From Swiss-Prot:
GO terms for biological process: autophagosome assembly; autophagy; autophagy of mitochondrion; glycophagy; mitochondrial fragmentation involved in apoptotic process; nucleophagy; protein transport. InterPro entries: Atg3/Atg10 (IPR007135). Its EC number is 2.3.2.-. This is Ubiquitin-like-conjugating enzyme ATG3. GO terms for cellular component: cytosol; phagophore assembly site.
Length: 317
């Protein structure tokens, strides 16, 4: 029944998006929405700092006229997913995630409650040295090591050592080597039997601009160790159960042919971003629109906690 409701909603929103005029004037600070031009600027900033992300054009027949032909959406491939969400349900790791998001589900609450009070903790890592200099600890999508960030070497986050030890930060390539991850899975299985099998999956992640909601929108499609497409039910295993079929639905990518993908619905993105902007302002800082996608990738982590695109980065604004 929920799938039928989602299908009807998707069709209605598709018509609404077609009829919605393109946002021309910036309303980022006031409402948390962005124009197509601001989306491109934020995307350029993401690609610059995180070379695993790149711009793509998609099918020519599906090009959106309000975006440059070669910058229709953002893409990162082969992002690892080492375990299923159910394996986190009663783990210390999940407790940390819940604690990080204010004990009430954080960003999850923004989809089930009328307010967005819980999202304040989503920017807990933002610290203000002074009104003109803001050091931000931002978790971003599969960021590779970039030589132009001198500040990255100072004051690394507590979990950076774990990432370095895992070897996930040893490559600057735009994609991860899935064959190595598959070999690792086999080694684990041989060493510890069935219980030790590392069920590695990989995901391709996409960020599009939603003209109706005037915000970015995240899409994802998964593969098993042999690079065979996952079923819908299998992909749902890697998504927080608080969001399956509610915040996350199966829809067709606006720029690509089938199959359909999982999509994080953007109905509350602007509301969350507005709260973050206000939180930063209360601390004496100012959040630039070019940082939008870096922040966006942080707060959607609550939806896909097992997909490992969160490499901690430090940025100074």
């Amino acid at each position: 029944m929920q799938n039928v409701i989602n299908s009807v909603k998707g069709t209605a929103l598709g018509v609404a998006e077609f009829l919605t005029p393109v946002l021309k004037e910036s309303k980022f600070k006031e409402t948390g929405v962005i124009t197509p031009e601001e989306f491109v600027a934020a995307g350029d900033h993401l690609v610059h700092h995180c070379p695993t992300w790149k711009w793509a054009s998609g099918e020519e027949a599906k090009v959106k006229p309000y975006l440059p032909n070669d910058k229709q959406f953002l893409l990162t491939r082969n992002v690892p997913c080492y375990k299923r969400c159910k394996q986190m349900e009663y783990s210390d790791e999940l407790e940390a995630i819940i604690e990080e998001d204010d004990g009430d589900g954080g960003w999850v609450d923004t989809f089930h409650n009328s307010g967005v009070t819980g999202v304040t903790e989503a920017v807990r890592e933002i610290s203000l040295d002074n009104k003109d200099n803001m050091n931000m600890n931002v978790k971003t999508g599969a960021c590779g090591n970039s030589g132009d960030d001198d500040d990255d070497e100072e004051g690394e986050a507590a979990d950076m050592e774990e990432y370095e030890e895992s070897g996930l930060l040893e490559t600057d390539d735009a994609t991860l080597d899935t064959s190595k991850m598959a070999d690792l899975s086999k080694t684990k299985a041989e060493a510890g039997g069935e219980d030790a099998i590392l069920q590695t999956r990989t995901y391709d992640l996409y960020i599009t601009y939603d003209k109706y909601y005037q915000t970015p929108r995240l899409w994802l499609f998964g593969y098993d160790e042999d690079r065979q497409p996952l079923t819908v039910d299998q992909m749902y295993e890697d998504i927080s159960q608080d969001h399956v079929k509610k915040t996350v639905t199966i829809e067709n990518h606006p720029n690509l042919p089938p199959p359909a993908m999982c999509s994080v619905h953007p109905c509350r993105h602007a509301e969350v971003m507005k709260k973050i902007i206000e939180t930063v302002a209360e601390g004496g800082g100012e959040l630039g629109v070019h940082m939008y996608l870096l922040i966006f990738l942080k707060f959607v982590q609550a939806v896909i906690p097992t997909i490992e695109y969160d490499y901690t980065r430090h940025f100074t604004m």
